[in-house]
C-alpha cells in the first residue's frame, strides 16, 4: 500500500541526485483545492485519452485517479510501448483515435507538447493539461520551469497549541544570502483531521535574519480553539536552497515539557528507523502527519521490531493532511528499550516526530530518521581502513556527569545493514581517550545501549574533566561489513529533575585529505 511516487534519489550511476518535485506539485494544498473541478471534467468525458510523453500519468493517478477513466493511453517514446501504463498497453500518439472527446496531456506548461501533436488531435476533441493544478505565478521562484525544485521549497511541521502543549518553529532567511529578493512563507495550518484552520503569508526578515512561528500567536491571530496538526510551509521567491529548514521547540505551561527537534525531511520515505521502544515507565507516541491530499489506508502504516519481518499495522485510515498519534507500545506491547522500531511509512508522510512520555510527567520530542533502501555494504571500507585512521566516526557528547546521564544506542539506518561491527571510544574533554570497548559484530535486531555511567563504574574509570564525548567506529577484528551509514541515538537525562532529551546523528570521516566513495 505504498504510494508509487519518487520523492528523493541519492547519488548513483546515471542519475541526478536530489529531491523530486512532481509529487510536491500534485500534492500541494493549493493543487488539492483545484483538483476536484479539474478531475470532475475528466470524469465527465465519454472517452478520455491520456497522452503521457513525460511519464507523469501514473504519479498523477496516485493522487487523482486516472486509470478508471482513461479509455486509452498514448506515449511519445516508442521505447515505452509494451510497458503497461495506467493498467493498459500504451499506443503511440500518432495512433490517437477519432472518437475521444477529451485528451489529457499529463504535463505542466504543456503548450509545446500540445503544439507538437496538434495535427493529430481530432476536430472537436478538447485538450486539457495539468495546468489547472498549477500554483499562481506569485508563488513561483522560477516561473519558466514549473517543476524546478526551487519552486517547491516546502516542508511540514508538527504544530499544536493545547493546555500544557505549545510549539514554536524557528527558522532563518538563508535564501537572501543567495540573492533572493523579498522572499516570504506561504503557510497553511491543518487540524488533526486535515481540515484547513488558517492560511496566510508571512514576509521574511533581511538576509540571515530569523523567523519565529509560535503556536500561541497563531492561535490568537486567527481566534482558534485548541489544535494539534500540521503546518505546511512553502518558501516562495527564493534562491539557492529548496528545503525549508527549522528547529521545532515544544514547551508547556509548567516546565514538564521542554524539548527541541529539527526539521522534518521534506521528502516522504518508504522506511524510517531510530524509533526507540518504551521503557517500563514510558509511553512512546509516533506522530504521523499525512503529507498528501489522499488518505492513508488503514493498515498502511506498519511497525516492526528492528531486524524482524513481522509487522503490525495501524488499523485506522488517516485522512488527507491529517495527523495521528500512534502509541508504539500498544501496537508492539512486548517490545521494550533498548529494542528499536522500524516504521514502514509507504511514502505517505515526512520524517515523523516521536514523543516519550514518562511516568514522572516529563515528556520530550525527537524524530526518527530516513532508512535508506538503496545502500549496500561496501567492501572498500574494510579494505581501506589502514588509510582511514578511525574511518567513519559517529560522535555523541557526554554531558557533565555530575548533572546528566548519557546513553548511546547504535541505530541501523539502511535496510541492507544486517550487522554493525563496532567499538566504542570514551574521550575526555581534554582529548584523552579514557576507555575503549569492542562491541562485536552486532546484528541489527540486537543492538545494546551504551550507558556511560555503567561503563565507567564497571571499569573503575572516570572522566578527569567530568565530561567529554563518545565515539562509535567500525571495528573489523572479527570480520563483518559496513556501508558508511553509521547512526546512533543519544539519550540524556538530568539527574535532578528526570527531564530528558533524545537526539540522533550520522557518522562522517572528519578532517581527512583523502576521500572514499565521493
Each predicted region: which residue ranges?
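Conserved functional hotspot residues at active sites or interaction interfaces
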Residues: 7-10, 24, 127-174, 239-292, ...
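Intrinsically disordered, low-complexity Pro/Gly/Ser/Thr-rich segments with frequent PxxP/GP/PP motifs
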Residues: 190, 194-227, 306-338, 432-463
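A short beta-turn/strand-edge loop motif at beta-sheet boundaries
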Residues: 175-182, 291-297, 413-419
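Hydrophobic, well-ordered beta-alpha structural blocks that scaffold small-molecule cofactor pockets
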Residues: 2-153
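Hydrophobic, ordered structural segments
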Residues: 107-122, 126-134, 209-257, 325-369, ...
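Short, structured motif recognition centered on aromatic/hydrophobic residues
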Residues: 169, 187, 230-234, 284-288, ...
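Short, surface-exposed beta-strand/strand-loop-strand elements in extracellular ectodomains
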Residues: 183-189, 298-305, 419-428
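Carbohydrate-binding surfaces of carbohydrate-active enzymes
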Residues: 170, 182-183
